[in-house]
């Protein structure tokens, strides 16, 4: 029986190395390949991770430096390559659009020479622009391309609410949708805990102060840049988000998760990639869910689409 599971991670900097190590932590692969223009960095990260496999608690995963030839027989390819926002910079991922779109074109040009069967998980920012480019420019099966999208914002949102109500964040339901970035929005109409809708939680959890939706939304957008400015980068949360998708694919879980892909008429939107709930399984994205949104939430979804389309137009991407 062949239980081989090969994952290629393109980009070995802060995010790529974190993804590789979380893959090992959760025993999601038998082989992890790191590819980077800086081969010394990729070699060092792979070697460091391989040393950890000697620990009694670790799985004997093969870590190594690779190249695009490794994509031929990969099950999953995770793309993290490209510059990101640095401490002190203007907090707008969309300003990276032109630069990273060119990088994605180069990376995908190499991948499609070797495979059109691997699941591709996008992390590179601006995430929705990168996902759109990869999905529309290379005749790669769209169901096999997803961006981590607002999965990370959803994790952050659930943590914020959990802290306010003193409950396990895994008991919080609800999505952050739209753009992975400044135009992300909380779909409050999907939010609740333990079977109670969001509007009942203050009373049920005995909060003395009414929850401010606006304050939560502001914190949700700002916290990523606070982490960047204080830590220098974000990598742990996004690595966990990527591994959630990897697990759903490898175990054919049919999990419904918010992720980025090209919209094909959902909410009356086309020709942009945005995050909405989608079912993810061994065949990639199996279906999308046009969950009911309030008029205000629907307006925010369309504003997110306009934001991403503006970035695409600015980069000359149709």
Swiss-Prot record:
Q: Where is the active site?
A: 180 (proton acceptor)
Q: Where does substrate bind?
A: 93, 125, 156, 234
- What Gene Ontology cellular component terms go with this record? cytoplasm
Q: Which residues bind NAD(+)?
A: 13-41, 125
This protein's superkingdom?
Bacteria
Q: What class of enzyme is it?
A: oxidoreductase
Location in the cell? Cytoplasm
InterPro entries, per database record: L-lactate/malate_DH, L-lactate_DH, Lactate/malate_DH_C, Lactate/malate_DH_N, Lactate_DH/Glyco_Ohase_4_C, NAD(P)-bd_dom_sf
GO process terms (BP): lactate metabolic process
Post-translational modification Phosphotyrosine, affected residues: 225
**UniProt feature coiled coil, ranges:** none
Q: Which UniProt keywords apply?
A: Cytoplasm, NAD, Oxidoreductase, Phosphoprotein
Q: Name one Pfam family in it.
A: Ldh_1_N
- List, in alphabetical order, the Gene Ontology terms for molecular function in this entry: L-lactate dehydrogenase activity
Cross-referenced Gene3D superfamilies: Lactate dehydrogenase/glycoside hydrolase, family 4, C-terminal, NAD(P)-binding Rossmann-like Domain
- Which reactions fall under this protein's catalytic activity? (S)-lactate + NAD(+) = pyruvate + NADH + H(+)
Oligomeric state and partners? Homotetramer.
| Family recorded in the similarity comment | Belongs to the LDH/MDH superfamily. LDH family.
Q: What is this protein called?
A: L-lactate dehydrogenase
């Amino acid at each position: 029986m062949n239980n081989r599971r090969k994952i290629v991670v393109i980009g070995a900097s802060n995010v790529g190395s974190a993804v590789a190590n979380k893959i090992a932590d959760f025993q999601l692969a038998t082989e992890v390949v790191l590819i980077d223009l800086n081969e010394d960095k990729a070699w060092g990260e792979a070697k460091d991770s391989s040393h950890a496999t000697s620990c009694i608690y670790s799985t004997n995963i093969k870590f190594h430096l690779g190249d695009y030839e490794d994509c031929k027989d990969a099950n999953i390819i995770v793309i993290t390559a490209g510059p990101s926002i640095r401490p002190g910079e203007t907090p707008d991922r969309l300003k990276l659009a032109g630069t990273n779109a060119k990088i994605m074109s180069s990376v995908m040009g190499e991948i499609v020479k070797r495979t059109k069967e691997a699941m591709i998980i996008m992390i590179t920012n601006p995430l929705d622009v990168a996902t759109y480019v990869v999905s529309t420019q290379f005749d790669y099966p769209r169901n096999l391309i997803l961006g981590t999208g607002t999965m990370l914002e959803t994790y952050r949102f659930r943590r914020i609410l959990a802290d306010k109500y003193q409950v396990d964040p895994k008991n919080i339901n609800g999505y952050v949708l739209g753009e992975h970035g400044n135009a992300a929005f909380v779909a409050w109409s999907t939010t609740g805990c333990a079977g109670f809708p969001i509007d009942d939680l203050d009373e049920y959890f005995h909060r003395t102060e009414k929850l401010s939706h606006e304050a939560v939304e502001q914190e949700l957008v700002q916290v990523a840049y606070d982490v960047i400015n204080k830590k220098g980068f974000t990598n742990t949360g996004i690595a966990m988000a990527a591994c959630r998708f990897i697990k759903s694919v490898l175990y054919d879980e049919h999990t419904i998760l918010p992720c980025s892909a090209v919209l094909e008429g959902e909410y009356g939107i086309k020709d942009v990639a945005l995050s909405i709930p989608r079912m993810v399984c061994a065949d990639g994205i199996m279906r999308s869910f046009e969950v009911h949104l309030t008029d205000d939430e629907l307006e925010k979804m369309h504003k997110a689409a306009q934001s991403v389309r503006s970035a695409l137009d600015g980069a000359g991407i149709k």
